[in-house]
């Protein structure tokens, strides 16, 4: 791990320690005063300023107590951005949230943070209570306001894979993959192992999964060894957004692909069909 990458990794670990200590002041020290946004893309919670984010932490943190935690299980960092696998325990927001987060830094401070997670196992009552109404749901995740600062090797791999996904071209996608690639769809609870089986799986689903046909690339975060790309699904899914995490080998080939999005927003019959497509 390069020194600058290790430094960002350490900063994020310190952030989660402060958040899990329920310390509003220490948590906010990690954010730039002119931050762009902190957004939960699943619930449509948008905090577009330092003051707005500080206010929501001040509202919730005094009610948290052990064993409530927010922690990272994997961090794929570059020098100025990262993809974070993270968990919010049920004591925080009423259910276990397994999140992929895109995080951008400027001068060592967080300027943009977007959480993506699948709500299908989350309590329906809480989901309906917390989710922003459709008419007010934010569609702009401010990716255009923050320049991509990901490693060139990651940008190359992410762009090639997303273009193949958008064209529903499984063979082109396979060209970017290591022979032992693992593909995970967190929303569909699907895992496929190996390039051969992954290619066959993609042939079956790229025309229908949100990250597939007609999807658009929005933003890339991470470093030489991995990160992720944010995307918007094609017109058939009403602007559903998601993220795909990537891990790379020394040659720039993709060794792991992990996608997440809110599958509660997909037609139930269509979701069942996609789940069934994991069977050869």
Region annotations inferred by a language model:
Residues 1, 8, 22, 27-28, ...:
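Intrinsic structural disorder
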């Amino acid at each position: 791990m390069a020194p600058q990458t290790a430094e960002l990794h350490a900063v994020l670990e310190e952030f989660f320690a402060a958040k899990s200590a329920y310390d509003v002041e220490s948590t906010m020290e990690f954010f730039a005063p002119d931050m762009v946004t902190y957004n939960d893309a699943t619930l449509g919670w948008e905090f577009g300023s330092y003051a707005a984010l500080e206010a929501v932490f001040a509202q919730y943190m005094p009610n948290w107590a052990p064993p409530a935690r927010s922690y990272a299980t994997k961090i794929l960092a570059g020098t100025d951005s990262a993809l974070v696998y993270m968990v919010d325990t049920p004591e925080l927001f009423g259910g276990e949230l397994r999140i992929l987060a895109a995080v951008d830094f400027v001068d060592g401070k967080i300027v943009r943070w977007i959480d993506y997670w699948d709500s299908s196992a989350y309590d329906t009552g809480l989901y309906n209570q917390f989710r922003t109404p459709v008419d007010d749901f934010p569609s702009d995740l401010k990716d255009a306001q923050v320049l991509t600062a990901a490693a060139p090797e990651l940008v190359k791999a992410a762009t090639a894979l997303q273009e193949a996904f958008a064209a529903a071209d499984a063979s082109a996608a396979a060209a970017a993959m290591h022979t032992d690639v693992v593909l995970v769809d967190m929303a569909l609870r699907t895992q496929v192992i190996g390039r051969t089986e992954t290619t066959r799986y993609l042939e079956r689903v790229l025309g229908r999964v949100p990250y597939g046909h007609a999807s658009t690339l929005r933003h890339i975060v991470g470093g030489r060894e991995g990160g992720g790309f944010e995307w918007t699904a094609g017109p058939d899914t009403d602007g559903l957004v998601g993220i795909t995490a990537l891990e790379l080998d020394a040659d720039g080939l993709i060794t792991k692909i992990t996608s997440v999005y809110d599958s509660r927003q997909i037609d139930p019959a269509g979701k069942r069909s996609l789940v069934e497509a994991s069977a050869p």
